[in-house]
């Protein structure tokens, strides 16, 4: 049934997941929509190679947000989607990972619905799963983890009205589950402290996978007690995925036979007396 505000000539908005970075991990449907779209509005996390593959006749605009840098306000992005669709154009809103996992796809969908614009979610491979697996770390494992929690690491865990229940997350990790933190590089010390203060053992394995699935991918491993220092020594930068839990140890078992960036080991990053303890894997 059509929306009462919907114009018969209105285009369709597609909220599309671009996957974790490697263009080969783009879904077949996403590829088709990019080839057929009139307009593509993409985020910064969408790789340059993927953007370059969009047909030249398509209007392409970067509406991404950089931490601490320039950004297109979300309200403006919402209005752009409505404006382009009402002009009769099919528009792809291209987001890194999956559009509904910390991608604000739900907010955009609500805005489109309020304005009578037909839309569709097109799922993508989320970095919450692809990031760890690219680094040789399964999100779950029959012998190690039967529970998985995924949270944003961008929120300040010390604020009194935090929407994240760090006590519950600590319980999951302590019980053998896996915690995946997205967008958590800047707040890594705070997030580690939040888990430590709630009883997670210092020796709990932790890994950070930077730019997962891309040629520049790097993986740093450590424990809750050492990961902040190791990540700092390796100069890990966004985008990176943090994995906490016993599944991180699987990497040590499989790394020698793992293909892709995670299977190729680069030089150690020195940090004085702990140089021997730091492993950075890089393609």
Language model: regions and residue ranges:
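Short hydrophobic/aromatic-enriched beta-strand-loop microsegments
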Residues: 58-65, 119-120, 139-149, 199-208
